[in-house]
Regions:
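Residue-level signature of transmembrane alpha-helix interfaces in integral membrane proteins
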Residues: 27, 71, 90, 148-150, ...
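Ribokinase/PfkB-type carbohydrate-kinase core domain
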Residues: 1-7, 100-179
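Conserved N-terminal subdomain of the carbohydrate kinase-like
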Residues: 50-135
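Short, flexible segments with low predicted structural confidence
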Residues: 15-16, 23, 41-43, 97, ...
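Glycine-rich phosphate/adenosyl-contacting loop at the front of the ribokinase-like
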Residues: 1-76, 115
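Active-site/binding-pocket entry motifs
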Residues: 12-15, 19, 98, 111, ...
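Generic recognition of cysteine residues
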Residues: 38, 81, 175-176
């Protein structure tokens, strides 16, 4: 088993980002790889760190596009799973007038939410210096249980744990948000 500087777990999705306007004045959207945990891994790869991803995408064109993007970036896909029934999660990203971004998610459910505890390769965690995860993997079952179990495995293995809150309120059930 290889050793990794950082192993991240969470959402891997397609961000449809506005990229200009058509001749008719309609917005043109570009399909880009997205998801906070993988964005972190991509930057770490550029800094020369060895990384791996744990998560789930749909067995669809977008899922295959994301797998290819991870491989091209140098991120290990050993922990990437494919769901044959649920599609890859999509997000439409639009800029507001103040320059901030607005996200509309198509995730009811999305493949990232369907990662099960038994699909997580805990050897990846035990062979990492840092385990990084984001809040979206805590929004729904079964990925919530898979994430909590993986956090516990990292803690038991003495792996440093990094958390990105990245709160997207529309994705949380009211009963789950506690302040």
């Amino acid at each position: 088993m290889e050793k990794y500087d950082v192993v991240a777990m969470g959402e891997l999705l397609i961000d449809f980002t506005q990229n200009g306007y058509s001749e008719q004045g309609n917005p043109i959207f570009e399909a880009n790889p997205g998801g906070a945990p993988c964005n972190v891994l991509a930057m770490l790869q550029k800094l020369g760190r060895k990384t791996a991803f744990i998560g789930k995408v749909g067995q669809d064109g977008f899922g295959l596009q994301l797998e290819k993007a991870l491989k091209e970036t140098g991120i290990s896909t050993e922990g990437l799973c494919f769901d044959e029934e649920v599609h890859t999660t999509l997000a439409v990203v639009q800029k507001k007038e103040d320059g901030d971004r607005d996200f509309s998610f198509y995730r009811k459910p999305g493949a990232d939410m369907m990662l099960r505890r038994e699909e997580v390769k805990e050897d990846l965690i035990r062979n990492a210096k840092i385990f990084h995860y984001g809040s979206l993997s805590l929004t729904d079952e079964p990925v919530r249980t898979a994430t909590v179990s993986t956090i516990e495995a990292a803690e038991k293995a003495g792996v440093w744990i990094s958390f990105d809150p990245n709160l997207r309120k529309p994705l949380w059930a009211v009963c789950c948000i506690r302040f």
